[in-house]
Amino acid sequence: MEFAELIKTPRVDNVVLHRPFYPAVEGTLCLTGHHLILSSRQDNTEELWLLHSNIDAIDKRFVGPLGTIIIKCKDFRIIQLDIPGMEECLNIASSIEALSTLDSITLMYPFFYRPMFEVIEDGWHSFLPEQEFELYSSTISEWRLSYVNKEFSVCPSYPPAVIVPKAIDDDALRKVATFRHGGRFPVLSYYHKKNGMVIMRSGQPLTGTNGRRCKEDEKLINATLRAGKRGYIIDTRPLNIAQQARAKGGGFEQEAHYPQWRRIHKSIDRYHILQESLIKLVESCNDQTQNMDRWLSKLEASNWLTHIKEILTTACLAAQCLDREGASILIHGTEGTDSTLQVTSLAQIILEPRSRTIRGFEALIEREWLQAGHPFQQRCAQSAYCNSKQKWESPVFLLFLDCVWQILRQFPCSFEFNENFLIMLFEHAYASQFGTFLGNNESERCKLKLQQKTMSLWSWVNRPSELSKFTNPLFEANNLVIWPSVAPQSLQLWEGIFLRWNRSSKYLDEAYEEMVNIIEYNKELQAKVNLLRRQLAELETEDGVQESP
């Protein structure tokens, strides 16, 4: 297919762009295969470059010969274009709708993007499973790297290499895979160096109504236990939902078959419920006419902060089991690709200082989301504005980033990255020039040959010139476990995501810049103090030598 076939009117003059907190701009609107561009001849006017893949929905209005297109973006931005001529407006709208909903992944911008920067590090090879295993290999002698899934034949949503107990061979893993939803047999998610306890993750067991069992599965997770120790199975579903799953062939671990494990059920809502929550929240944030009571009522009705509280509570429980009770845990919901990954990731941020650094967090995203099979292509296909909702779209990853932001806000000195880093990840998960978030799992990414045909997001982020934008000036390495508060009073609406297009950030930006300047000045003064102390110590040493007989 040629993009030209979808572009009926490639260029329109005298188009007026309206954006909140910016003066209206008149210019020329151009459509390309992947971008909507508005360019003005006025001096000091910023051009608009908008990826078609970032467009969630459009509305059309007409007043006489003037047409208006309202573009609603996946990053929650709303842009208005006033276009002279009804035919031109209809053609532009038709092209935008077609170009923003391309069916083929290989027609998306990452396959056409050519970087203008020097690639210092190939991000596709920055966080390979073998490299991550090397970090633990000296301390986890009871574990091994298995390539049982190298052809993606055992589990289509797992990567080729996974970490499993050394006592379990590949034949046993194949049998366990037939007992777990989607073939997602239990694998290592995190090893707690402090006491050797682990977090494992999987899909639900396929016990069904007949109480089916799998001795290889029991042996696998029991291999993670120390003598005389019990473990915890954290099921992210309420008990009634887990019981209903048995009628569909799913279920949960029976106590009779797993006597050394205590099962705990939590109440994290499934992904389709989260989508409605996001729609309500964004709708409320965009309503500028409501009074305080109505705003607070609509915010509460969205249940967004309730979802955050439940996810963080479950992550804290997992971290507590590991760190304070010295118990290993297995985490799963139904598929093991959504709420499971939220909990395993957040538990690691609480427990592991490395996950709070920029590269450590990138490794976490790569390991616990991309390689672990979170279906980004489905979940991030649309955002909060699209009318034709599919059942698989859901802000699971955005909720995770929001939870991270809540912890970052409570521990502002313990994270090497800042809020802008989290916002950037949100934006690129929904629309990007990079191939990192394309596809639903490693199997799909291999078939698409993303490593050969697209650029990794990490290749761009990890350049020194970009890293400076995402570095937290308050960061001081903290090797302790951090315990976030999940009290309702401690959780806040993430204004940097949900209100950034509805209020000016000018004064916040100025305050942030001033804070950075103060910190840099303080470092300079500290360096001078240290220099003077060294000089004083040298002078005192010289005086002591001269006074000695």
Curated annotation (Swiss-Prot):
Modified residues (Phosphoserine): S548
UniProt keyword annotation of Phosphoprotein present: yes
The UniProt record lists the keyword Coiled coil: yes
Quaternary structure, from the entry: Homodimer. Heterodimer (via C-terminus) with lipid phosphatase MTMR6 (via C-terminus). Heterodimer (via coiled coil domain) with lipid phosphatase MTMR7 (via C-terminus). Heterodimer with lipid phosphatase MTMR8.
Single GO term (MF): protein phosphatase binding
Protein name: Myotubularin-related protein 9
Topology within the bilayer: Peripheral membrane protein
Source species of the chain: Bos taurus
Gene (UniProt): MTMR9
Classification via PANTHER family: MYOTUBULARIN-RELATED, MYOTUBULARIN-RELATED PROTEIN 9
